[in-house]
Amino acid sequence: MPTSVARTGGNLPNGAFIPEIWAQRLNDKYYAQCFLPEITNSNYTGNITGKGGSVKIRNRPTVQINKHVVGAPIKYQDITDTFVELFINQANEFAFQIDDVDAAQSDINIMNELTIDASYQAKIAVEIQVLGSIYGDAGVVLPPTAITSANVLAWLIQAEVALEKANTPPSDRWVILPPEIGGMIQLSDLKNVYMTGDAKTILRGEMSNGRIGMIGSMEVYISNNLTTIGGVTQCLAGHKSAVTYASQFTNLKTLTLQDYHADAIRGLNVFGFKTLIPGALVSLPATYPAIGN
């Protein structure tokens, strides 16, 4: 029943001639930004055969360099072969149904709207799982730090130094932070050139959704998908080669249900991830004043 203007008297008292109007445009819905394609590699996605499979990834052997001694016999090294294994051992699913009557009477394509939402939610769910796991694999772990706009630069430079010492290539380095720390960066001496007028500012590059530029050689991404435990957020820095990730929707079906007058869609997303180079991954546990939810 629509809300009517207050009235007195007996003329048209029930509001029967005031229609309810439903907008065809759905209310805007916002989704967490996802950055797995930017911070991990997907070199082995083509090897996925389904949940329960695995991919053996061979490591390049290390050749020893010895000093040459004139007249001494040459010593030939026994080469050690090693590998790591990427297990496709995780899966997420979704399933929903729309009654035929609802589909026929609706003025919007409900199935299409729900499918769009499912695609976003699937990406977010996987990213939360990956980010919530790989920080435990980091070869470098900084001490928990209370971050402010005064110390955020020194804190981030520690991560850059760790990546330099690991000999990671300058390209494809990254750091992923919560929005609050992103805000501190913009309030600090790292603020971008448009705010400071300083062509030598450390924070540089174009700003886009979830990306606020570069600090040193690290792309800076802002995410709501980081893990927080006991008030400590597990921020991460690394190189794209550090973690490999493989994912596929192996079972996406549209069904006509047998026992109901309804259609349904269900999907199965199988995936796996593996830290290949722990030294190219830095854990930056941080505390900060939270804003909002």
Language-model-derived ranges and their functions:
Residues 2-42, 46-64, 79-88, 95, ...:
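Sequence/fold signature of self-assembling virion shell proteins
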Residues 52, 93, 170-172:
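Short coil/turn connectors at secondary-structure junctions
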Residues 68-69, 108:
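A short, polar/proline- and glycine-enriched secondary-structure boundary/capping micro-motif
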Residues 70-77:
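Short Gly/aromatic-enriched secondary-structure transition segments
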Residues 90, 100, 177-179, 269:
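Short, structured patches in soluble enzyme cores that scaffold and shape functional sites
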Residues 100-168, 283-293:
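Alpha-helical scaffold segments that mediate packing/assembly in large oligomeric complexes
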Residues 138-207:
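Extended, solvent-exposed, turn-rich assembly/linker loops in the middle of proteins
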